[in-house]
Amino acid sequence: MADRAEMFSLSTFHSLSPPGCRPPQDISLEEFDDEDLSEITDDCGLGLSYDSDHCEKDSLSLGRSEQPHPICSFQDDFQEFEMIDDNEEEDDEDEEEEEEEEEGDGEGQEGGDPGSEAPAPGPLIPSPSVEEPHKHRPTTLRLTTLGAQDSLNNNGGFDLVRPASWQETALCSPAPEALRELPGPLPATDTGPGGAQSPVRPGCDCEGNRPAEPPAPGGTSPSSDPGIEADLRSRSSGGRGGRRSSQELSSPGSDSEDAGGARLGRMISSISETELELSSDGGSSSSGRSSHLTNSIEEASSPASEPEPPREPPRRPAFLPVGPDDTNSEYESGSESEPDLSEDADSPWLLSNLVSRMISEGSSPIRCPGQCLSPAPRPPGEPVSPAGGAAQDSQDPEAAAGPGGVELVDMETLCAPPPPAPAAPRPGPAQPGPCLFLSNPTRDTITPLWAAPGRAARPGRACSAACSEEEDEEDDEEEEDAEDSAGSPGGRGTGPSAPRDASLVYDAVKYTLVVDEHTQLELVSLRRCAGLGHDSEEDSGGEASEEEAGAALLGGGQVSGDTSPDSPDLTFSKKFLNVFVNSTSRSSSTESFGLFSCLVNGEEREQTHRAVFRFIPRHPDELELDVDDPVLVEAEEDDFWFRGFNMRTGERGVFPAFYAHAVPGPAKDLLGSKRSPCWVERFDVQFLGSVEVPCHQGNGILCAAMQKIATARKLTVHLRPPASCDLEISLRGVKLSLSGGGPEFQRCSHFFQMKNISFCGCHPRNSCYFGFITKHPLLSRFACHVFVSQESMRPVAQSVGRAFLEYYQEHLAYACPTEDIYLE
């Protein structure tokens, strides 16, 4: 049964997936703590851009909304999944029954009369009984192209059978032609009241009518599941007189009221038993199921699903949505790698999303075992419904969800200067306070973050979270915390709210954009984020309303970052934002890609060593080190111990000498800059974050990093707003400088040598985003650093390009002389 199951899964998902489509890689929030961004760009960016057609997705949602009846019953379907792969004993029984049927067919041909050529359409197929309230799904897949058939002459190449008694019919099974085409063993067919068995004629019904052709792979049918299409088409074809044969080769238009019986009709023709075990595993998140199913499907269908390079379809807005015309296909990035962050969470070709959408659009409440595919919990006051709100968001991203709901605007509106009129229509009462808006073109469930149970989302300052299924660990924690807080009728207390704040710590969920009262990107300094109390008076009234909504969680009316219960994150101001990991994480970050410097005792000092091992102090005078910590060695002891300063934590102490390696300093670059006077340009921008990438150049790589960094920070706007920084560009390289919050960390910087900068550029659709890729000084590793500004960042890109060009023109003469080519 293994080969049949694989063939079954392969053919099913060949019809479910568009041509040349690769399963999107998992882009989840917890991946920021791992070594790199390989899940985005495993194949150097070529796996980033495969997004299905937005027109197809719109037609999918529109087509399904026309059918208000319940699609299917998942309780019966989950109970009958075992019919797909049966045991070997039934295989042996079916083989014996097949031999008996062949003998019976031979007898029928010898003793058949002309009256047996046309079967009686009336009593052959029993009507559904009272115990079967739901229409059954089709039992098989049409795996071959059917030839022309004539029901009168019966020239379709199938054997005739004589009317048999009920004793003989009980021992008969499907014809060999149909049995070879079925994915698994089928039980014996039932008979009508007259005792005559319906002839086995795959591909046509009892009156010789050809069934509807199956949808082409990647077509815009109302649903991508053949089982759903069966129910949808059976409504339109119900007026025909004839009913489908029980052994028809899975026309998606079959009515399923056939002689297959209850077990035969409940078989779902899209999931094998092995995949069912993955999809119904209790306690696991839906993203785990989705990724496992996608991986198994990719392995099975990789030879057949990529016959030719995919053509470029019109795409939905992918990276930072910019304005009302972002559904066009004019994006020319010079690379095929245009990723969509939530494609894997919302692609209609994923099986888990088919199931979840069938759940959300059925008129009757349907629940899977353990509610494994149910949407995220929603407060009672939230007006967005699973089907209506999601469809409304997908069709008009700028439309408001309701008077008290979540309003969605695009990213260009957020970055643009304040317009005289509102950027998006706001039905209902006017909203006095500012709101945090997130673009949601991918039909994610929108839930307010701080909405208390029994109270609607505050219209003054609504914080929305796109609860994608792929954000498994983060959303699991948040859903559990939301259920715990909803269970307490007394409102949100600090006790049950602490785990939610723990799930929103800076190093777990990074890079969120913040919007002020003018719907612009709010430029928040690091001093405000560092915990200075006097900054709380500078907050606007809208931010005060946000603090009031989350007062119990964040503690009082202070700045949200001030009262974070995470003691390791209290020293956040001493870190170079997300570039440095906290003391509890052992994962390597991107701080080793440049030289870190900060003010120590009023003097700017650069790091001299980099920690290569984690050192846990055992005495009070020892210094704790984490991997890749920047260290300033002040003295070298005789016993191979160093006395130094950890620039990440701001602590001094001794540590073993072999726990840190010296970093190459820019001595030659300094000498070169002193000989020839160099220019320096400074820009005031906001630093969003750094993330490691597997390739040193490419617009696709750059846009993927920007997309991941900018969209993944949308949950931590209150805790970790973007920090302002000065970008100094010269022939030496690029230096990032930002202010700290402590007396000892008034200013810290990160320097990237020009020889290690390999690529830079602005976002093709939104020039407010800029990033550059740097190489590790010693290793073959690459990191992308992303910045944002209220204005266009093209002058920054031009300045870096100018410095890049001049540097290589100056050093190319001795670094790569042309005469070396002809030495031989």
From Swiss-Prot:
Residues 604-665 form the SH3 domain. The modification Phosphoserine is found at residues 254, 302, 305. PROSITE patterns: PID, SH3. Residues 110-275 are annotated as: JNK-binding domain (JBD). Residues 268-305, 451-467 have a biased composition (Low complexity). This is C-Jun-amino-terminal kinase-interacting protein 2. The keyword Cell inner membrane does not apply. Belongs to the JIP scaffold family. Keywords: Cytoplasm, Phosphoprotein, SH3 domain. Residues 77-110, 327-346, 468-484 have a biased composition (Acidic residues). Residues 1-28, 40-160, 172-349, 361-501 are annotated as: Disordered. One of its GO terms (biological process) is social behavior. Residues 239-498 are annotated as: Necessary for interaction with FGF13. Expressed mainly in the brain and pancreas, including insulin-secreting cells. In the nervous system, more abundantly expressed in the cerebellum, pituitary gland, occipital lobe and the amygdala. Also expressed in fetal brain. Very low levels found in uterus, ovary, prostate, colon, testis, adrenal gland, thyroid gland and salivary gland. The JNK-interacting protein (JIP) group of scaffold proteins selectively mediates JNK signaling by aggregating specific components of the MAPK cascade to form a functional JNK signaling module. JIP2 inhibits IL1 beta-induced apoptosis in insulin-secreting cells. May function as a regulator of vesicle transport, through interactions with the JNK-signaling components and motor proteins. Coiled coil: none annotated.
